[in-house]
Amino acid sequence: MPVLEVQGLCKTYPKFRLENISFMLEKGRIMGLIGRNGAGKTTTLKSLLNLVHPDCGKRTFFGLDLESHEQEIKCRIGYAGGAVDYYHRKKIRLLADVTKQFYPNWDETAYRKYLNVFSLDEQKTPSELSEGMRVKLSLTLALSHHAELLILDEPTSGLDPVSRAELLDIFTVLRNQGTAILFSTHITTDLEACADDVTYLAAGKMIASEPMEAFLKRGPSLQEIMVQYEKENLREKLAE
């Protein structure tokens, strides 16, 4: 049984449409969601969790439909997005105390472990943190309740190379423990270092969703595959 199955996800805005996105993610696998800026990655991730309400489509987590089991599902998921709205002048300790009330499986030992791993001072406020450290705070809160699935929007954005490498190592450890991870990124080398599967979006449409090994048969690297596709797409538009 897949940890996550998405069927026919659609969302329309005045100048953008997410069209018929379908993919599945198994336990203990990492899926990278790639695409250029504006491709629909963030809309897809937010639609999975009803942070954006899709126009159509079915989202199933752990065999449960999101529409009828949303609260139960969200207790089993960790989410971190680049635009998480914190109380910027409240101390991290207070944010953790508020967050843990929503998760029966909150683990204070795990919370303190990730504070140490990410060198976070819980007496500081988010307003005192750099962009990269705020990403680490998001991940600390997401990882502290033993989520079975992590959904992460650009988690390596703003991190220095050493911190990115450390985070990818953590992803690998979590995968080996059975956690499924879905994360968007424009840093394709991060995916090549740890992802099992790739879903590629372009202009709101799904171009491919398949194992990394199969996807890389299209070209020498994720970046080269994306650049080649986008170039061909541009040529077709110019020829119209």
Regions found by a protein language model. Give the residues of each.
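Catalytic Walker B motif of ABC-type/P-loop ATPase nucleotide-binding domains
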Residues: L150-E154
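Conserved ABC transporter NBD signature motif
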Residues: G57-S68, E72-I73
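ABC-family P-loop ATPase nucleotide-binding domains
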Residues: C75, G81-L137
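Conserved beta-strand
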Residues: V6-L9, F16-E26, G57
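Helical segment within the ABC ATPase nucleotide-binding domain
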Residues: R164-Q177
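Hydrophobic anchor residue at the start of the ABC signature
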Residues: L137-L139, L159
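The feature captures the beta-strand-to-loop junction immediately N-terminal to the Walker
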Residues: I34-R36
